[in-house]
Amino acid sequence: MDVTLAAGSVWTDPACPVARTVDLIGDRWSLMIIRDAMDGATSFTEFHQRLGIARNILTDRLRKLVEHGILDKSAATDGRRHTYRLTEAGQDLFTAVVALRQWGERHAFAPDEPHSILVDDQGRELPELHPLGQDGTPLSAEASHVRKTA
């Protein structure tokens, strides 16, 4: 499923993938909901308890993430509540969330300040993400550029 902008909304910069992504998921609460969905949260109550977000804001962000194709909403087994799960598009955000986390670990904490650590199923810390060129060499912003398409 492709992600879409809500009806009546306009892209900030229609030709830019970064701008479109920010239009879809760039606010603080949406990213935290996506992060917590990746960490196993599936219900309104779980998101609310983990985030401490106002209920009306949580309702709005969950609705938008479902509309945008990031989360799937389905009836819970009790039939009264709903569960939220990442769609394929939502799961594809994992690398972006890891990159944001790793940037935060490097730049948003003092050297000895404690913080959570993302680990794999064996308890090992994830390696640093680095974009690689076609030949396997590391890339930097200086070694790449945006090519505009018609």
Q: Which role does the model predict for each range below?
A:
Residues 44, 48-75, 80:
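Canonical helix-turn-helix DNA-binding module
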Residues 14-54:
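N-terminal helix-turn-helix DNA-binding core of bacterial DNA-binding proteins
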Residues 21, 31, 68, 97-107:
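Alpha-helical linker/hinge and terminal dimerization helices associated
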Residues 1-13:
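N-terminal intrinsically disordered/low-complexity leader segments
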Residues 26, 77-97:
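Basic, amphipathic "hinge/linker" alpha-helix immediately C-terminal to the N-terminal HTH DNA-binding motif
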Residues 1, 98, 102-150:
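C-terminal regulatory/oligomerization modules of transcriptional regulators
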